UniProtKB/Swiss-Prot annotation:
Regulation: Inhibited by Triacsin C.
EC top class, as a word: ligase
Gene: SLC27A1
Matching InterPro entries: AMP-bd_C, AMP-bd_C_sf, AMP-binding_CS, AMP-dep_synth/lig_dom, ANL_N_sf
Domain of life, per lineage: Eukaryota
Species annotation: Homo sapiens
Protein name: Long-chain fatty acid transport protein 1
Membrane topology: Single-pass membrane protein
């Protein structure tokens, strides 16, 4: 875009003509002619097409910044902000459990969280102490971390799918002095009890399973019934920059990391979602996402705690109950993540899916290939796709419904929100730098790593990192925008078009090179899944001895062993370039996913195409014969020895 140079030329021409004594109208017309002739027409086109979008985005940014500044100056925290909501509407429904039908008003949520605060203060816990929470999503989950926050304590929110080593690891790295777990988690806690420190105090909440209560465990619910529901007599001196709780990364590439969430980050994330998608106080939000992650607990529950919306919780997503729940509770906003939209499209068409009042679906991970199919089939007017990790400072949002886009950054005023796509080595993901040692910005259409400039004094740009200092340092680069600055490295590759819309490409490590070409796992997964009726698919690269690059491998869910590999190949030939067609197929009962419905590839990549590592059906694409062959140990040996041409 040549707007800066064109603008300078037009200003110079305007000054010269004015000095010559020509009327200002003639001078302005001549300057405009120079501007357009110098390439400025591109900038004018961008202004015309994006001004409305950018002005709305700017208004959201300003609004969130002003709200945050007001709360910071007043010394508020999330519990203090929630207290104001309770005083405004004590009897309005705050949380509804769709699984049990249990309803909590704002006054009841306030009383429960007060009981939690008073109890843990009486038990000797102090501000700054960490308490781990390990139970399924229900109103008590919110009341527990909110109550701990009222007492100045910090919750570590554990993924309920963790077991054995990962569970013990997360508990150990959290520094928790106590563990609150649900009755449904007794067996999981029992498995790691021998690895937990003797000083860890354990509390169990909810109905006990057949295992009964574990040794040295206190029943929490009776203790809470005896605790005072009045506000704490002494409110801890906390502010918006203090820690609220810890959320663990999904662990798709290894053991989870504890991301630090401060009060201002919680507020910022919830506020951006609220204003960017024009949520209203009368909205009812359906939240079937895990509460141990930010989408469910901040973007979703945050609308309740900060803005007073009613939030309907379901502890686990159910494709068959989704629209029935929305109809029953008059939901107007729903959340999605990962593959949820695809799972809904897999359901048989029925009348109920159009009788709802849902106008907005907010989330991330909606594949462009099914975007319009989802909106047309279910009658949802707006998709609020966004991009952003729990800890990142470069979140973006699609505010105007651009199909396939996960957000935008203004081309008119790019420095208002200092994020950027920068060039990287596509094999190593190493930052590429210019002669001055600065990162090289990508041009429109060029894929690059998303980075955000860090300013710890600005709540919109700060990066709080992880409990692990080494993990934090790995996410920071220096001299990115300017000499000596610091920037957050998202680890994600996006591409921006000429109008500033950004599109998610791949998480770093999810692209691989084969036959001199870059293969996008996201693209191949989308194509395969669509061909197979929205089946779960994981695509990744595997190393083959003596062969440059990585060969594509696709793991496909085939629980009833009905898929024909060669029928799949016939279809792939029509829609994928030769280098993108998977060389190896793995047909398995189900594809592993995380708690947020993201495909889990770590185990699959480790096992590769070695038939000794799995009992799943494996196939190899014989290019000479033009079809897939069963891959047994003999074929595996021949591939590794170079007998087959890849």
């Amino acid at each position: 875009m040549r707007a800066p140079g064109a603008g300078a030329a037009s200003v110079v021409s305007l000054a010269l003509l004015w000095l010559l004594g020509l009327p200002w109208t003639w001078s302005a017309a001549a300057a405009l002619g120079v501007y357009v002739g110098s390439g400025g027409w591109r900038f004018l086109r961008i202004v015309c097409k994006t001004a409305r979008r950018d002005l709305f985005g700017l208004s959201v940014l300003i609004r969130v910044r002003l709200e945050l500044r007001r709360h910071q100056r007043a010394g508020h925290t999330i519990p203090r902000i929630f207290q104001a909501v309770v005083q405004r509407q004590p009897e309005r429904l705050a949380l509804v459990d769709a699984g049990t039908g249990e309803c909590w008003t704002f006054a009841q949520l306030d009383a429960y969280s007060n009981a939690v605060a008073n109890l843990f203060r009486q038990l000797g816990f102090a501000p700054g102490d960490v308490v781990a929470i390990f139970l399924e999503g229900r109103p008590e989950f919110v009341g527990l971390w909110l109550g701990l926050a009222k007492a100045g304590m910090e919750a570590a929110l554990l993924n309920v799918n963790l077991r054995r080593e990962p569970l013990a690891f997360c508990l150990g790295t959290s520094g928790a002095k106590a563990l609150i777990f649900g009755g449904e988690m007794v067996a999981a806690v029992a498995e790691v009890s021998g690895h937990l420190g003797k000083s860890l105090i354990k509390f169990c909440s909810g109905d006990l399973g057949p295992e009964g209560i574990l040794p040295d465990t206190h029943l929490l619910d009776p203790l809470l019934k005896e605790a005072s529901t009045a506000p704490l007599a002494q409110i801890p001196s906390k502010g918006m920059d203090d820690r609220l709780f810890y959320i663990y990364t999904s662990g798709t590439t290894g053991l989870p990391k504890a991301a630090i969430v401060v009060h201002s980050r919680y507020y910022r994330m919830a506020a951006f979602g609220h204003h960017a998608y024009r949520m209203q106080a009368a909205d009812v939000l359906y939240d079937c996402l895990p509460l141990y992650h930010s989408a469910g607990n901040i973007i979703g529950v945050g609308q309740c705690l900060i803005y007073g919306l009613t939030v309907v919780l379901r502890k686990k997503f159910s494709a068959s109950r989704f629209w029935d729940d929305c109809i029953k509770y008059n939901c107007t906003v729903v959340q999605y993540i990962g593959e949820i939209c695809r799972y809904l499209l897999k359901q048989p068409v029925r009348e109920a899916e159009r009788r709802h009042r849902v106008r907005l679906a907010v989330g991330n991970g909606l594949r462009p290939a099914i975007w319009e199919e989802f909106t047309e089939r279910f009658g949802v007017r707006q998709i609020g796709e966004f991009y952003g990790a729990t800890e990142c400072n470069c979140s973006i949002a699609n505010m105007d419904g651009k199909v396939g886009s996960c957000g935008f950054n203004s081309r008119i005023l790019p420095h208002v929100y200092p994020i950027r796509l920068v060039k990287v080595n596509e094999d190593t993901m190493e930052l590429l730098r210019d002669a001055q040692g600065l990162c090289i910005p990508c041009q429109a259409g060029e894929p690059g790593l998303l980075v955000g400039q860090i300013n710890q004094q600005d709540p919109l740009r700060r990066f709080d990192g992880y409990v692990s200092e080494s993990a934090t340092s790995k996410k920071i680069a220096h001299s990115v925008f300017s000499k000596g600055d610091s920037a957050y490295l998202s680890g994600d590759v996006l591409v921006m078009d000429e109008l500033g819309y950004m599109y998610f490409r791949d998480r770093s490590g999810d692209t691989f090179r084969w036959r001199g070409e870059n293969v996008s796992t996201t693209e191949v997964e989308g194509v395969l899944s669509r061909l197979l009726g929205q089946t779960d698919v994981a695509v990744y690269g595997v190393a083959v001895p003596g062969v440059e690059g990585k060969a594509g491998m696709a793991a496909v869910a085939d629980p009833h062993s009905l898929l024909d590999p060669n029928a799949i190949y016939q279809e792939l030939q029509k829609v994928l370039a030769p280098y993108a067609r998977p060389i190896f197929l793995r047909l398995l009962p189900q594809v592993d996913t995380t708690g947020t419905f993201k495909i889990q590839k770590t185990r699959l990549q480790r096992e590769g195409f070695d038939p000794r590592q799995t009992s799943d059906r494996l196939f190899f694409l014989d290019l000479k014969q033009g079809h897939y062959l069963p891959l047994n140990e003999a074929v595996y040996t021949r591939i590794c020895s170079g007998a087959f041409a890849l």
